[in-house]
Regions:
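Conserved donor-nucleotide/metal-binding helix-loop-beta segment in metal-dependent transferases, i.e.
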Residues: 131-140
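Active-site acidic Asp-centered loop
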Residues: 123-124
Length: 140
């Protein structure tokens, strides 16, 4: 899920070790698209990569409607990694921030009927799940 606005993180950026670029990203991007690590890949890349290592190839990524830059990145990643990415768009119902995880899942299930009759794994975009943990959940 990648539609959250990272308000708690934006209010806690105060370390002198944080670069101005990272501060700018935290103020202009959702958490999952902030670049991390030596590769400077968005955080969501590492989540997707661990899912691929756990044999997951189909993804439903929840975004806000104003996420064209992220959609472009994800379409390029989809081609590069030979995976399938479906976008769901979370309606904020006129609010500044989305309602939360359960609402995001509910809206996605309404946009993709096949999810109503199948098992799926939910990964928040601000947590890095190990390949081992993903495999355990998938095989449960």
């Amino acid at each position: 899920m990648a539609a959250g606005v990272s308000s708690r993180m934006k209010n806690s950026v105060s370390s002198s070790k944080i670069t101005s670029d990272l501060i700018n990203q935290s103020n202009t991007r959702v958490k999952g698209f902030i670049e991390v690590g030596n590769r400077k890949e968005p955080f969501i890349y590492y989540i997707i990569n661990n899912c691929i290592k756990a044999d997951i190839r189909d993804f439903y990524i929840i975004l806000s409607n104003n996420s064209k830059e992220f959609q472009k990145y994800l379409r390029n990643l989809e081609k590069k990694l030979s995976i399938n990415i479906n976008f769901a768009f979370q309606d904020f119902y006129g609010r500044e921030k989305p309602l939360g995880t359960s609402d995001a899942i509910f809206q996605t299930m309404n946009q993709y009927e096949e999810l109503k009759n199948n098992r799926f794994l939910v990964c928040n975009c601000d947590n890095l799940y190990s390949t081992k943990a993903i495999k355990l959940l998938v095989n449960e």
